[in-house]
């Protein structure tokens, strides 16, 4: 099993030589980058922030060896539109698009509103500044009938009343990707991801990432693979760039986000966003509504501090806990980020970024190797999509809606919906992280679950009556931690959170309950007791020759009459 885990981690990626061992020049964590070790080394990288940075757009058509353009790749074309020469609809397609600012009321697949709310509860609407990076030579025109969005661009806004430490500019970076099989009439939506960055803009000369059309860059050469020609380059310092986003002449440098500001993004989407979202938010909120074939999605929350684990060791100084773990794995140095030339001394950095429970044991080994202390940390406001998975009771049959949002500040977590624990009748969620931050302080975790109320009721078979919940944080040994927990239900969404728990590998267990509808007591009715039949007495009374017969319960003869019978 361990061999399989390593195999799935990361394709081999050769990166340029760099003469620095680590980012030791005082850069803030928001500008973290992986640099070349000075000597032949082995190391680890556990950081999901890089996937959101330095985005690019592309629309590519693939020709394959088998019918329907499947099988091995024989040709790749960059496309500026769909269905044109070389980009015929019969081919296999991959696309990467950015979601721009909604410039008009009729614009779709865009972000219509950016709002920041301070600790005083006052909200401030952001002002659009510019598209960034703007249009590039890889931009393309979408096709709504084929569910293909325009290539778009990320953008920068200004929020003067909610500044960060270096100014009031914020980069809104949102990306959508998808694909289309040759025989399919429409594109399938793949990953949807978004981040907010506090930025300043600097001038320079940069190589921006782009999708390669060189077959040699596709090691397996099968339809469905994607490849970037490079991860970007800063010609000014001859190194990988620190930019969160860049053009050929400008760089958006990221700085710490204000942790007490709640940011809210509103998306106006024609392309459906479904399943689950996961990410880096505190006090997370989600809302979705549909009208006239469009979805309006609102995601809100505060930034969090996330540990970044990156450490390399000279090959002859790898800690024993690491060498023992990989002792029986012949592929230990075959999979990961590879640095250097083909000299036999190619440094390997293991990239743990599948975010699955299978990687947790490996992560815990590396935590031990770094004394359970994260070398870096960064503020983050981000989320991305995942599929619904199988959460029991057939409740995922409606795949057209957003089911929920799970967020945490943990270095590593399971990037899927909470697992329904049938034995405990609970929703379980696993996280793991180093115990300490770079400054030596104890790292305190948080967890937020926002789940569609109808979906939660379906899982448990609940009625529409109110739901209550308990949230327990269980340490690795099964003991329960003391944590602050919150539950509320509003506008069709259940919101639960747990905070201030410690690591290294706790499980968050959410138990939803609902009081049974009281069985009505039998209605008490009072019936009149049946009246007993009154006994009637008959007498005969006489007065001279006159006689009267009287009948009653107590008959008496009239005055002047005498009872004779």
Label each residue range with its predicted role.
Residues 115-118, 124-127, 144, 149-151:
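Long amphipathic alpha-helical coiled-coil/heptad-repeat bundle
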Residues 15, 73, 81, 96, ...:
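Processing junctions and N-termini across compartments
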Residues 529-565:
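Mature, structured domains enriched in cysteine- and short glycine motifs
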Residues 23-123:
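Charged, amphipathic alpha-helical stretches
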Residues 1-22:
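Secretory targeting and sorting signals
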Residues 158-538:
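Extended, non-transmembrane interaction/recognition domains
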């Amino acid at each position: 099993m361990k061999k399989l885990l390593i195999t799935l981690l990361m394709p081999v990626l050769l990166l340029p030589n760099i003469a620095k061992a680590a980012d030791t020049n005082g850069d803030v964590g928001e500008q973290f980058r992986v640099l070349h070790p000075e000597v032949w080394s082995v190391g680890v990288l556990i950081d999901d922030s890089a996937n959101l940075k330095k985005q690019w757009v592309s629309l590519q058509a693939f020709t394959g060896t088998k019918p329907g353009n499947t099988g091995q790749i024989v040709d790749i074309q960059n496309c500026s539109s769909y269905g044109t020469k070389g980009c015929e609809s019969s081919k296999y397609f991959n696309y990467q698009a950015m979601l721009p600012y909604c410039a008009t009321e009729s614009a779709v697949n865009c972000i219509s509103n950016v709002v920041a709310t301070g600790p005083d509860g006052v909200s401030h609407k952001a002002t659009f500044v510019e598209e960034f990076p703007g249009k590039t030579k890889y931009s393309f025109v979408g096709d709504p009938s084929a569910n293909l969005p325009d290539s778009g661009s990320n953008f920068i806004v200004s929020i003067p009343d909610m500044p960060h430490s270096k100014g009031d500019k914020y980069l809104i970076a949102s990306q959508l990707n998808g694909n289309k099989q040759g025989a399919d009439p429409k594109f399938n939506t793949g990953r949807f991801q978004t981040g907010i960055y506090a930025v300043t803009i600097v001038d320079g000369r940069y190589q921006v990432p782009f999708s390669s059309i060189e077959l040699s860059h596709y090691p397996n050469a099968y339809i469905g693979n994607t490849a970037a020609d490079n991860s970007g380059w800063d010609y000014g310092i001859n190194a990988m760039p620190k930019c969160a986003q860049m053009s050929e002449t400008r760089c958006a440098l990221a700085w710490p986000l204000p942790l007490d500001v709640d940011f809210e993004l509103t998306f106006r989407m024609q392309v459906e966003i479904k399943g689950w979202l996961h990410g880096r938010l505190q006090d997370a909120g989600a809302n979705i509504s549909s009208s006239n074939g469009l979805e309006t999605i609102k995601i809100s929350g505060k930034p969090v501090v996330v540990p970044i684990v990156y450490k390399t060791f000279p090959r002859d100084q790898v800690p024993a806990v690491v060498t023992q773990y990989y002792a029986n794995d012949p592929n230990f140095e075959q999979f990961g980020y590879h640095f250097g030339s083909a000299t036999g001394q190619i440094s390997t950095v293991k990239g743990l970024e599948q975010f699955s429970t299978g990687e947790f044991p490996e992560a815990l080994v590396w935590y031990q190797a770094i004394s359970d202390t994260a070398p870096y940390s960064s503020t983050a406001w981000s989320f991305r999509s995942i599929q619904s998975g199988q959460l029991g009771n057939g409740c995922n049959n409606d795949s057209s809606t957003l089911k929920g949002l799970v967020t945490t500040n943990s270095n590593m977590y399971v990037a899927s919906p909470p697992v329904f624990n049938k034995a405990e009748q609970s929703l379980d969620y696993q996280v793991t992280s180093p115990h300490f931050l770079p400054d030596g302080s104890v790292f305190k975790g948080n967890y937020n679950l926002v789940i569609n109320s109808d979906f939660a009721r379906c899982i448990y078979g609940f009625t529409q009556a109110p739901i209550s919940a308990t949230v327990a944080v269980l340490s690795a040994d099964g003991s329960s931690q003391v944590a602050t927990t919150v539950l509320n239900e509003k506008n069709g969404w259940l919101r639960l959170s747990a905070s201030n728990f410690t690591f290294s590998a706790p499980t968050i267990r959410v138990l939803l309950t609902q009081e049974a509808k009281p069985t009505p007591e039998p209605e008490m009715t009072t019936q009149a007791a049946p009246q007993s039949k009154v006994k009637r007495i008959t007498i005969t009374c006489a007065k001279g020759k006159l006689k009267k017969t009287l009948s009653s319960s107590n008959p008496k003869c009239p005055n002047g009459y005498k009872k004779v019978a």
